[in-house]
Amino acid sequence: SSPSMRNTSIDLLDAIPRAVVAIGTDYPHGHLLPSHHHRRAQLLYGATGVMHVRTEDGNWVVPPQRAVWIPPGVAHEVLMLGVSTRSVYIEPAAVTAMDARCQVISVSPLMRQLLLEAVELAPEYDEAGRDGALINLLLHELLRSTHLPLHLPLPKDPRLLGLCQEFLKRPNAHVS
């Protein structure tokens, strides 16, 4: 059996001649991934825990059973709260039909299972066999997934932005 794709970096695998690279990563609680971007598109899925994702378009709070679609080249910062990810990194040409903005999507039981399976594949999986079929089905499921309104656009005004950011940190605090 091949080594599974766990706790490795997309940077080491970006050039693999496959449309999809799937990687699973276990993060310590409260781990912050500083702002970064990828050449490939990313579907960021937390099998456990909650992710706080920040982009120029706004902030998303992403519970389990949800994933974040991050288009190619879009900078994102992620706070991991008890998260074990199963991410797929996709060649831009394979997902031209997807939205050019970040989205939170619903992950069906089938898609969840495909994501869990994908990280167990060899990096250079057999495109003509079962593994290739699994990846193709994952892409089909991604294209028909439902977008969810968990997006909080943030105001550009610095004073208002400050208030909103405080509120996001402590949503139960009433600001008078």
Please report, for each region that a protein language model flagged, where it lies by residue.
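Short histidine-centered beta-strand/loop micro-motifs
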Residues: 31-38, 78-80, 97-100, 127
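Ligand-binding loop in jelly-roll beta-barrel domains
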Residues: 73-102
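Aromatic/histidine-rich interaction motifs
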Residues: 100-112
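Basic, amphipathic alpha-helical hairpins
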Residues: 121-126, 141-149, 164-175
